[in-house]
């Protein structure tokens, strides 16, 4: 074997071997336990970034480890290939989204191969191909026939100048990103899937997900937002309809002093006809998109509609206001306000001088002080007529029952979750398979006309979707009648909601899934991806699985048994201030730094001499120019080094700080492993290991070897603390480097140790392990080698360390046989000269012995 570790020579050879031998291609095999390891599929943006590398390295380590346990391991990869960035890039580069996307896929595929990931490339899929999205279109038409799909109007961002819909990220400070025109909100018809029909199941089944992070489950619980409350109807003077509100706190109902409706509510619209201030306010609300997340922090505004509602229990008139914190698409578009006991209602009432009435006592039984804020805690009712003196639960039930008896209240379970709007007014997505006849009848596209293919040879003007701009594309015939195709495309979360299932049968032509293959591989055993997908993708992913189950395609309730959310990758960030005061971010690669004795950066400049401001470690991003190109690192150190650093530098679910010094450390370690194997193999043949003939020192080393195997197995398999597994291997390597190589049993023991080390490193550093395994004459290829098994008998300690005390003070430590008697331990202690001098001339009055641990001699 060559003396030096040269990753640039070995890695490409090993990758070629995997390709030619189709090492990681798998098929269903009922005789083997399956393991489906999946990392979230990448968007083909053009280049891999370190976040990808971390995600896919974690997945590959787990997949290779499970394979070495003898399981049938599926680890597929594909491309989440539709989406808005391709449209922008196509316009910028004067091309179409399709060629840009396919070029990126080709480039990134090479990058994935360069990193040595053990994927089954025969299952590769790209979601932008008709072969993939045809099944999604067919499934959508089936959901429509089941009543799970409907169309309704919904608000979008509209640019009046370009006459086009804008995605949220295309609205900059309320204006169109292209022409800077003020963006309006416009209601247009859109398609929805009834995820709310599955709200209870999506909520309850979270309890089955024992191996999902609690943070993700909590986020989904809150997003689904199940609540129990009462829906209450109010009569309104001079208004034909009743006003309905939903509350989870009917116990506070006697403190309701005003109602608030959304700007889009029919009552507000009616009132605005004679109220210019209200009309202007409604206009302002319409053109301000408010994300629900921003609701809590934005300024609360409102206008009195002039209408008065009648409180059903007190008969009092209470004002109805239009307010910007009420959304038409949530609940009934109206809320009751109890400013004494809700902070938002309190702030609004204080701002506009509305009545604040306390109806819940403070915890100490006194009237609450509402001079600065609302009392939001539950408590005993007062100031509430017949309900005064009741506690929260009794008050809730008594008021709910009274309202029900009067016919103006009904107990209801509510959800925050809204149906999934899947329409996008973009081009680069799967066409929605619906048509409209000349008489306005809407129908699903007939099966014989599927897939509805998105034309790829298009010209992008950056404004209108090519399929909307071309009237001919929409024309079709259904049952002999002329019809127009839907020109909206699917939300790209559609494609990523079921790709994991299609990987089980990517070539299947008879339908969306081959149930036999799907049920062999599913559910996914471990799914790896970022926590930023906790509510959108991971909720749709669970929802789609249930839809496919109810269509008879899969027989499990949940798509993935375990979810591992990897931490972000951070890097140093630097900038200098330009002539106009702007920040110019400089790549950490180009920063020349000075450090103090603790290694902290104290000064930095770039090659041009700019003094740099160091802002600390932050997430790698384009905006801060602190991304490190994985390809450059692989070319410099090799894929195995990059992979090893990624897994060693931090626990998988914590943030990872990119430090090139750490990468260099990982590289030095691999060179040490290589050198030890080289020195060992160049000494010639190795005798068989004779365990019975080992010396005490050799037994101790063998004990360390097998304890390391046990620890690494537990760390990777059960605990998934990969960094501590690597640390244990490094510790063992330090011992092996110092181990004598005098006689043939020393060398036989070294052979056993190195075969174990190379296999334990295989999930992390597969190229080096593959090569070293062959040099050590391991059986077959390491890709088919079994994981090393710890020899229990080798780990048994035949001696133990006993602490010796005289009159309670430690005077020495002795090594004795594990099965030594108390007499033998006392005798051995007396021979220890440090102990003996404290016993000299004294009488032992009492002996306290804790077997195998402590001997305390009380003398006088």
Swiss-Prot record:
Q: Name one GO cellular component term.
A: cytosol
Q: Where is ATP bound in this sequence?
A: 622
EC top class, in one word? ligase
Predominant cellular place of this UniProt entry's protein: cytoplasm
Q: Which UniProt keywords apply?
A: Aminoacyl-tRNA synthetase, ATP-binding, Cytoplasm, Ligase, Nucleotide-binding, Protein biosynthesis
Q: Which domain of life is it from?
A: Bacteria
Annotated GO biological process? leucyl-tRNA aminoacylation
On whether Aminoacyl-tRNA synthetase is a keyword of this UniProt record, the answer is yes
Q: Where is this motif: 'HIGH' region?
A: 42-52
Q: Which reaction does it catalyse?
A: tRNA(Leu) + L-leucine + ATP = L-leucyl-tRNA(Leu) + AMP + diphosphate
The record's EC number reads 6.1.1.4
Span(s) of short sequence motif 'KMSKS' region: 619-623
Record GO terms (molecular function): aminoacyl-tRNA deacylase activity; ATP binding; leucine-tRNA ligase activity
List where in the cell it is found.
Answer: Cytoplasm
List the PANTHER family: LEUCINE--TRNA LIGASE, MITOCHONDRIAL (PTHR43740:SF2), LEUCYL-TRNA SYNTHETASE (PTHR43740)
Question: Of which family is this protein a member?
Answer: Belongs to the class-I aminoacyl-tRNA synthetase family.
Q: What is this protein called?
A: Leucine--tRNA ligase
Taxonomic classification: Bacteria, Pseudomonadati, Pseudomonadota, Gammaproteobacteria, Enterobacterales
């Amino acid at each position: 074997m060559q003396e030096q570790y040269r990753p640039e020579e070995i890695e490409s050879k090993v990758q070629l071997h995997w390709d030619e031998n189709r090492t990681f291609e798998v098929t269903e095999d009922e005789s083997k336990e399956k393991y489906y390891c999946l990392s979230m599929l990448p968007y083909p943006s053009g280049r891999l970034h370190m976040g990808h590398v971390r995600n896919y390295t974690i997945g590959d380590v787990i997949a290779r480890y499970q394979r070495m346990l003898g399981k049938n391991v599926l680890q597929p990869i594909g491309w989440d290939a539709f989406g808005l960035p391709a449209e922008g890039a196509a316009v910028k580069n004067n091309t179409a989204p399709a060629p840009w996307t396919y070029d990126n896929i080709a480039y990134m595929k090479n990058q994935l191969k360069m990193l040595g990931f053990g994927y089954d490339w025969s299952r590769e899929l790209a979601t932008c191909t008709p072969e993939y999205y045809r099944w999604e279109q067919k499934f959508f038409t089936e959901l429509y026939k089941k009543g799970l799909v409907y169309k309704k109007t919904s608000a979008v961002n509209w640019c009046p100048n370009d006459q086009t819909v804008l995605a949220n990220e295309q609205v900059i400070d309320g204006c169109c990103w292209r022409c800077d025109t003020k963006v309006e909100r416009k209601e247009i018809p859109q398609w929805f899937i009834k995820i709310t029909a599955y709200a209870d199941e999506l909520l309850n089944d979270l309890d089955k997900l024992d191996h999902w992070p609690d943070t993700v489950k909590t986020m989904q619980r809150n997003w689904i937002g199940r609540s129990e409350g009462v829906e209450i109807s109010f009569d309104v003077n001079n208004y034909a309809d009743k006003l309905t509100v939903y509350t989870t706190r009917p116990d506070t109902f006697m403190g309701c002093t005003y109602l608030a409706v959304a700007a889009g509510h029919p009552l507000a619209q009616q009132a605005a006809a004679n109220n210019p201030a209200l009309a202007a306010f409604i206009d302002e609300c319409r053109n301000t998109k408010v994300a629900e997340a921003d609701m809590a922090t934005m300024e609360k505004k409102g206008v009195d509609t002039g209408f008065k509602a009648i409180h059903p229990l007190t008969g009092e008139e209470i004002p109805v206001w239009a307010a910007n914190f009420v959304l038409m698409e949530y609940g009934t578009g109206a809320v009751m306000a109890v400013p004494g006991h809700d902070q938002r209602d309190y702030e609004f009432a204080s701002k506009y001088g509305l009545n604040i009435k306390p109806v819940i006592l403070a915890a100490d039984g006194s009237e609450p002080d509402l001079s600065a804020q609302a009392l939001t805690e539950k408590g005993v009712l007062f100031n509430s007529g017949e309900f005064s003196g009741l506690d929260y639960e009794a008050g809730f039930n008594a008021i709910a029952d009274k309202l029900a008896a009067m016919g103006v209240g009904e107990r209801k379970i509510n959800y925050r979750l809204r149906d999934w709007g899947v329409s996008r007014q973009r081009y680069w997505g799967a066409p929605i398979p619906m048509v409209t006849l000349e008489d306005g009848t809407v129908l699903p596209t007939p099966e014989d006309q599927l897939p509805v293919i998105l034309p790829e040879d298009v010209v992008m003007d950056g404004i209108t979707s090519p399929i909307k701009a071309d009237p001919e594309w929409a024309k079709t015939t259904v049952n002999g009648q002329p019809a127009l195709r839907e020109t909206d495309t699917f939300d790209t979360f559609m494609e990523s909601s079921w790709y994991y299932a299609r990987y089980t049968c990517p070539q299947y032509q008879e339908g969306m899934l081959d149930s036999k293959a799907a049920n062999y591989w599913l559910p996914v055993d471990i799914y790896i991806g970022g926590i930023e997908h906790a509510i959108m993708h991971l909720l749709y992913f669970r929802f789609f699985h249930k839809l496919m189950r109810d269509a008879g395609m899969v027989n499990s309730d949940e798509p993935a048994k375990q979810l591992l959310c990897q931490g972000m990758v951070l890097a140093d960030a630097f900038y200098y201030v330009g002539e106009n005061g702007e920040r110019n971010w400089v790549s950490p690669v180009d920063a020349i730094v000075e450090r103090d004795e603790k290694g902290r950066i104290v000064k930095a400049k770039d090659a041009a001499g700019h003094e740099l401001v160091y802002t600390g470690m932050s997430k790698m991003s384009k905006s801060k120019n602190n991304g490190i190109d994985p390809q450059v690192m692989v070319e410099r150190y090799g894929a195995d080094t990059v992979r090893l650093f990624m897994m060693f530098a931090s626990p998988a679910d914590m943030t990872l700080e990119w430090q090139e010094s750490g990468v260099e450390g990982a590289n030095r370690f691999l060179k040490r492993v290589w050198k030890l194997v080289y020195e060992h193999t160049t000494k010639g043949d190795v005798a068989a290991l004779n365990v019975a003939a080992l010396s005490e020192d050799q037994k101790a080393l063998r004990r360390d070897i097998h304890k390391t195997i046990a620890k690494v197995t537990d760390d990777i398999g059960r605990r998934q603390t990969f960094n501590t597994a690597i640390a244990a291997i490094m510790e063992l390597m330090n011992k092996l480097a110092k181990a004598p190589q005098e006689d043939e049993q020393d060398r036989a023991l070294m052979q056993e140790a190195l075969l174990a080390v190379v296999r334990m490193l295989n999930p992390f550093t597969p190229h080096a392990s593959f090569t070293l395994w062959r040099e050590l004459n391991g059986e077959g290829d390491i890709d088919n080698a079994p994981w090393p098994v710890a020899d229990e008998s080798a780990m048994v300690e035949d001696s133990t360390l006993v602490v010796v005390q005289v009159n309670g003070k430690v005077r020495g430590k002795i090594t004795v046989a594990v099965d030594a008697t108390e007499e033998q331990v006392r005798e051995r202690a007396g021979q220890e000269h440090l102990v003996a001098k404290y016993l000299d001339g004294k009488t032992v009055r009492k002996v306290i012995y804790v077997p195998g641990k402590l001997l305390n001699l009380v003398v006088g």
